[in-house]
């Protein structure tokens, strides 16, 4: 059933529209052995509740538009323990929530190979996101990537081609707290920022703000030798710590 997806909204009988799915005040635990844990065609909204997801493909997938949380709310709790890709839509907005992701490809992905000339976008304006991928990009948009609020901690895989933050268009950091780590520090990315951030990896370090250094420096601080990757026996959670000598929770807007 449902192509072995956990939950799927398919096409409606109305030729002018496709089905949508809204999740509100539910507690769901889904293990999808083949395809997506939750799949919607036109619109997927996760407003509140608790989702515990594991899947062989994408944990949360929508062909077009996905909204997670809402401004002024605590939003949902989403724990993705295992997936190929974590959260995928052509246009993805995260406004609130507590989200943890462990996957083997992109943690957040704005893409759809069936759409041409689409304004692909990832927009993060609130919530707490802790994401780790073993072999992909942390956040990957085929268009723009904008972080204007929230607390973001992301690790990308060991492959030098992968970046913690990756976009075909502009990456804009205008608010929130951002810590991104991986083998590539994203030196070639099209980054526009108006506030403090930290991006580091074995290929280099970049950053700005009042860290005791100039843009492009790290204020004398050194990243962990393992590239910021969590220990193999660690579990992702809202206070996830990657190593004994490095604690992203300590890096708040007050001491960046």
Regions found by a protein language model. Name each.
Residues 1-256:
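A composition-driven surface/loop motif
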């Amino acid at each position: 059933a449902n192509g072995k997806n956990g939950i799927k909204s398919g096409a409606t009988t109305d030729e002018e529209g496709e089905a949508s799915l809204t999740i509100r005040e539910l507690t769901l635990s889904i293990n999808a052995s083949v395809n997506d844990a939750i799949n919607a065609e036109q619109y997927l909204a996760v407003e509140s509740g608790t989702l515990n997801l594991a899947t062989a493909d994408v944990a949360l997938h929508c062909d077009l538009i996905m909204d997670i949380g809402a401004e002024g709310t605590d939003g949902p709790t989403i724990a993705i323990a295992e997936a190929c890709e974590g959260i995928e839509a052509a246009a993805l907005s995260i406004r609130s929530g507590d989200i943890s992701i462990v996957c083997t490809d992109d943690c957040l992905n704005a893409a759809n190979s069936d759409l041409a000339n689409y304004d692909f976008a990832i927009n993060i304006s609130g919530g707490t996101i802790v994401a780790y991928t073993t072999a992909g990009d942390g956040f990957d948009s085929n268009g723009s990537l904008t972080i204007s609020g929230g607390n973001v901690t992301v690790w990308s895989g060991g492959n030098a081609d992968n970046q913690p933050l990756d976009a075909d268009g502009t990456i804009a950091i205008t608010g929130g707290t951002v810590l991104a780590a991986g083998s590539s520090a994203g030196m070639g990315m099209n980054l526009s920022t108006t506030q403090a951030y930290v991006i580091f990896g074995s290929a280099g370090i970049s950053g700005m703000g009042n860290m005791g250094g100039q843009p492009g420096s790290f204020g004398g601080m050194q990243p962990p030798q393992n590239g910021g990757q969590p220990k193999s026996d660690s579990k992702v959670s809202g206070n996830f710590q990657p190593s004994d000598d490095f604690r992203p929770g300590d890096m708040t807007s007050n001491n960046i």
